[in-house]
């Protein structure tokens, strides 16, 4: 057991998404779309680490998106296909998928996933996603954590200024960030976690 897991066992913190039910996740999607004034009807949406497809399924019902999901679990993808027969689902490593896909997207979701990758890998992933976003498209990084927070024993938290530095390097991306607890409410969200929205503003 690593230090992060031990801390979570003692304090009950960590893995906030495990506390969230279907209704919570659907409300998060709705509030994020409202905040960015996004109309995704008929557009391609990619969920990297899609789990059982709760977010994609909600968007499919509400906005008739073209859903794409990537996950390592066969069982998760089986559930996705049951919910969305017309979806496109891949059992693949996220970086390997991003290396081969030719599809362009108007939203890419990375909720509770990016911290599983090293900081260098996170830079690579975001750069690859930027290349497959349409102009006006949004990368939603949920459950982001920083090294100075109570998540200092998390697998790979990022340093303060990480996203500002990325956007200074990649001028095609615009940054917006907010507290998940403030926006989504209901007390299930850790005040140290943020949602990061990176919008592609130019080629």
Residue ranges and their predicted role:
Residues 123-135:
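A short glycine-rich, Lys/Arg-flanked "PGG" loop and its adjoining helix->strand segment in the class I
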């Amino acid at each position: 057991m690593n230090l992060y897991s031990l801390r979570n066992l003692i304090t009950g913190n960590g893995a906030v998404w495990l506390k969230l039910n279907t209704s919570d996740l659907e409300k998060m999607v709705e509030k994020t779309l409202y905040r960015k004034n996004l109309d995704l009807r008929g557009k391609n949406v990619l969920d990297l680490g899609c789990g059982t497809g709760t977010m994609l399924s909600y968007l499919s019902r509400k906005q008739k998106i073209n859903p794409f999901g990537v996950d390592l679990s066969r069982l998760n993808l089986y559930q996705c296909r049951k919910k969305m027969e017309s979806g496109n689902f891949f059992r693949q490593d996220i970086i390997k998928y991003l290396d081969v896909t030719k599809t362009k997207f108007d939203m890419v979701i990375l909720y509770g996933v990016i911290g599983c990758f090293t900081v260098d890998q996170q830079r690579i992933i975001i750069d690859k996603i930027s290349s497959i976003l349409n102009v006006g498209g949004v990368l939603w990084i949920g459950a982001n954590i920083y090294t100075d927070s109570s998540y200092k024993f998390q697998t790979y938290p990022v340093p303060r200024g990480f996203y500002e530095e990325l956007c200074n390097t990649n001028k095609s991306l615009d940054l917006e960030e907010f507290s998940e607890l403030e926006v989504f409410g209901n007390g299930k969200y850790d005040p140290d976690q943020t949602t990061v929205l990176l919008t592609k503003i130019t080629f």
